[in-house]
């Protein structure tokens, strides 16, 4: 019998005696039932584990279970590489999840790790790091894109406009939009389309959630359905690839990748503003989160409450929403109103 435990082909084998029977079982259960996690979460977990395991091998450390002092050194290594605080926190978060799901204490529960994260945040802020967010795709942007593309007869333009309309209207994540099938669409008495979403990143329920489309966005989606032929099979995904000859390729088995949907945002931004510069910086064009950010900001401007915004976007963390809308009141904050009142 081998004295090594392999949990994944891309991760180093573990000595069996390094953990208890219960921890080993929990760890194997987690990798066996990986479909319980979103595709994005699982990819990030594996990416972090590979990075962490490679660092451990290079520095003669044990990758699992992780020692707090080793995690501390790893986080400082990430900082030295120039990674942003948010990225470093994501690495720690995935290591936390790995240990918690295995029935072990989270590395961040240790004093060594929690203190070094405070240190990293302080040092990075003092060095001039500022939190970045996806470039917002707001109502004015959507209206501009629609005015440019709504009269186009190109199948790709019709698809892209319908996708952007749904993304902004519903605040769904692009992976959630990719999973929409024709059979998930129904009609309200007022003629609006109603999309049934079986699961989201924060909601897994047989009841799902319903997202109503405005009449304007409904027309954009109707046009796409008409020219694409996706309605021929109710099991077809709503959005599909468009061949080089300009003809849609409906499919009930192959959904558009999130990268392809990201590309729609990027291509649309390029259409309006031209190519990105060569600085290599992120968020210089619209991305998969842009519509969610833009819609949240537009709702905040319109006086929609934070709980309502969170419900619309499926957010469970208020800090995420506050980060999206953080600069909206820069010219209308309480002290500005107080000082300028009567001027």
Curated annotation (Swiss-Prot):
What biological process terms from GO does the record include? DNA integration; DNA recombination
One GO term in the molecular function aspect is: DNA binding
UniProt similarity note: Belongs to the 'phage' integrase family.
Q: Where is the Tyr recombinase domain?
A: 130-338
Keyword terms of this UniProt record: DNA integration, DNA recombination, DNA-binding
Segments forming domain Core-binding (CB): 18-103
Q: Which organism is it from?
A: Escherichia phage P1 (Bacteriophage P1)
Record's Pfam families?
Phage_integrase (PF00589)
Listed under subunit, the entry gives: Homotetramer when bound to DNA.
What's this protein's function? Catalyzes site-specific recombination between two 34-base-pair LOXP sites. Its role is to maintain the phage genome as a monomeric unit-copy plasmid in the lysogenic state.
- Record has DNA-binding as a keyword: yes
Domain of life assignment: Viruses
Q: What is the designated name of this protein? A: Recombinase cre
Q: Which PANTHER family has this protein been placed in?
A: DNA ADENINE METHYLTRANSFERASE, PHAGE_INTEGRASE DOMAIN-CONTAINING PROTEIN
InterPro entries in the cross-refs: CB, DNA_brk_join_enz, Integrase-like_cat_sf, Integrase_catalytic, Integrase_recombinase_N, Phage_Integrase-like_Recomb
Residues forming the catalytic site? 173, 289, 292, 315, 324
